[in-house]
């Protein structure tokens, strides 16, 4: 009986020990889940992901502008879609405002001579053809036409605003085209965007590769052009949050749409992740942020 009692006691002790271990494991898991699911952390992740999406949109707008420099604007075709009539037609087949409310200066204003500095001056503010208010100056230095392999366009800003957002930093586009596909490397260096309505800011650095995947055979008809974007970025904001991002499903940009229409970006912040989903090809300004599987709709 003593042996049986001892064995039973040992078995009971093992069961109790195992139960305590399981209870301890469950407690640890619940703590981790609670940490990742607090409203404050969810809000911080959503804020960082929204900042990422807005930064992408605003600096993509700079790419569009530098790519739309044509002979009617600057005396010669400098951009990659230069045959399109009118600045800011890119991404807007139904222009909001037909009145030109900006000035352009070119130095030297001699066709074929590079480098060439192009300054677009929006003055104290005007409503552009894509429906956005801009003011200040965009200053771009072209080493050659954007369609020439190896050409670079370096853009900086002087008191430049898009709606309520002040834009700072350096935007560089380099032509990396091959014999059968047009491509560009696009960098944002020390980018900063400040919302003057609430003084919130975000700093952003980005490295993206842009490939033209449709429309390569119709050089003089850009409306069928489609671009694939891959790459990564990192940023921080005035809320004290930092993050990094990676394109996990190539972003798709159509010439005929001013917004990214498809693709996914994974954002990482303090060991937490979010997924930014641009949709399935529909041309709209809506994206969805998924945090712990929960969707949050944002408007770009």
Task: State each model region's role.
Residues 27-300:
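Low-complexity, intrinsically disordered segments exposed to solvent
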Residues 2-12:
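Bacterial N-terminal signal peptides that target proteins for export
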Residues 2, 26-27:
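A general lysine-centric signal
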Residues 21-24:
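C-terminal motif of bacterial Sec signal peptides marking the signal peptidase cleavage site
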